[in-house]
């Protein structure tokens, strides 16, 4: 009863708080940037990872529409929306569409949206998690659209782990 009252109060006492202590930001570790999350990922055309090979081909609709922006590589990742209708953010945009990663474009890399794997990395999924599953007789398929929805609906894996760990550590306090 005491734990329930504490957990439903406007200011949850630290002793009962199920959320992990803040670890990143000012006076803490630096935030994980998109550059950090994308380290060692090949471009889709040379990747062997099916989740890195596939990305939304939705055309650029103008900056007035959702998902028509280029990610900032030196910043935290964008919100990965479950209902993006193909309008997942761009990994890189052409200069004509307002892109800033002109050095990458100059190297011949193409304007494209984030891959399924890049979205998964932003949400801290491990690389061995398979999102794209081709149809076979022994298992149902999972499309890229389904994969984007799964990733967008997910609580980031590292956050979920730390909340679960904190609850496990306080289990006896909650249920005594």
Residues covered by each model-derived region:
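S-adenosyl-L-methionine-dependent DNA methyltransferase catalytic core
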Residues: 1-176
